[in-house]
Amino acid sequence: MDAHIASGTFRLGFIGMSNAGKSYRSRKLSEEKGFLWYQVDEEIQKAFGFSDRGQISGWLGLPAAPEYPEREKKYLELENECTRHASMRTDGKNFVFDTTGSVPHLEPETLDILRQNCLLVHLDVGEGKLERMMEKFFEKPKPVAWCGHFFVRPNESQNEALRRCYPELLKTRLAKYRELAHLTIPAQDVFDTSADETLAVIRSYLRE
């Protein structure tokens, strides 16, 4: 790791739940250590011609909407393209890859390329945080890529289906992040840390 950092060839990818700290850690590495920060969300936003991520959410909508399946398909195709492209980038400097929450649902070939070209660090929020994430979602449901994890049963309302399916989506993603990552680090271990402190934590887990 240190040899790669010194030669400007270190390639780090953060994966994990929304609000786990992926973007904050990436920004710190960019500002304090000069890493090239690649934000998949931002690249998707640009490709769609939206001015902010809120517009992506508004366009994608909730899963019961008739236009949702086709829009989700377009979103995931673009995410897959951006992720695969960035995984193979070489820009002559250290690189931090800020992935989306839906990254484990991408094509297996793309995930293989990502794993082969980056040290994937999962910022793990832990099962204990899932309940709060569910509460926040139901306070103000926001569009997400459901990736086949949403369906409405007979005589079930959309809200009831969301309440049944969303916890399963989170649990599935958490398991997939852990399976995909080279290292799983509790998100709290790098909470509010500097770039050097973040790298030191990653280094300590590599030595275990």
Predicted regions and their residues:
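NTP-dependent small-molecule kinase module
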Residues: M1-T9, K28, E32, E160, ...
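P-loop (Walker A) phosphate-binding loop of NTP-binding proteins
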Residues: M17
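Post-Walker A helix-loop "phosphate-sensing" segment adjacent to the P-loop in P-loop NTPases
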Residues: E31-V40
